[in-house]
């Protein structure tokens, strides 16, 4: 980030000096666009499985220091720590142990017994699967096959393989799937189909 700041200052200074020279200014502007975002976007597009497009948008898998992240547009779909099995099994971001959903999942055995039936709308990277306990029955509802592929099949994220190797995944619109399920088939249902700060009221109400 410090290096980027220095480069930005240099480009800004050169830009000021070339304001009168149209060709030089355009060339400098193009270089700035490539340096700040464009190059990274192009390199991600060329990496195998780093970008995946589906009917629902573009998914981007990017690596940071000690973690891997899945983005859908501007929304973070999940972050997994890397470096050891224990780190890979650790729920992160808004699924962390102290979060609301984390506390609900940890309380499930006491509230519903060792055979609790857990449903999750929205698979993401599969983070919530690491709250699964022996004897529980978990079911994920996911509308996008691309998300299932990223979370389960590519090996980029290992929440499912580490914590719940053979999950039940219902592919399709969760509203339809839940309507088809028999009444009282779940003890705990987590809704994780939000898109950024846009709340899906059609899932929150009758």
Explain the meaning of each model-derived region.
Residues 6-168, 174-179, 187, 198-200:
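Class I S-adenosylmethionine
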Residues 204-206:
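A short glycine-rich, Lys/Arg-flanked "PGG" loop and its adjoining helix->strand segment in the class I
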Residues 184-192:
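Short SAM/SAH-binding signature in class I
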Residues 195:
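Flexible, active-site-proximal loop/turn residues at the rims of small-molecule/cofactor binding pockets
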């Amino acid at each position: 980030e410090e290096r980027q700041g220095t480069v930005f200052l240099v480009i800004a200074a050169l830009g000021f000096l070339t304001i009168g020279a149209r060709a030089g200014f355009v060339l400098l502007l193009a270089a700035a666009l490539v340096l700040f975002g464009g190059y990274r976007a192009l390199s991600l597009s060329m990496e195998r499985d780093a970008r995946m497009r589906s009917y629902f948008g573009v998914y981007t898998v990017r690596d940071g220091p000690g973690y891997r992240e899945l983005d859908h547009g501007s929304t973070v779909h999940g972050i997994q720590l890397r470096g050891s099995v224990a780190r890979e099994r650790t729920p992160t971001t808004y699924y962390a142990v102290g979060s609301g959903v984390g506390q609900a999942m940890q309380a499930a055995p006491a509230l519903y017994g060792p055979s609790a039936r857990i449903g999750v709308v929205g698979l993401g990277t599969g983070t919530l699967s690491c709250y699964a306990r022996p004897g529980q029955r978990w079911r994920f509802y996911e509308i996008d096959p691309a998300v299932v592929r990223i979370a389960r099949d590519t090996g980029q994220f290992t929440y499912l393989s580490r914590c719940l190797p053979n999950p039940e995944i219902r592919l399709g619109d969760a509203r339809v799937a839940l309507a088809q399920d028999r009444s009282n088939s779940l003890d705990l249902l987590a809704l994780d189909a939000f898109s950024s700060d846009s709340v899906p009221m059609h899932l929150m109400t009758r």
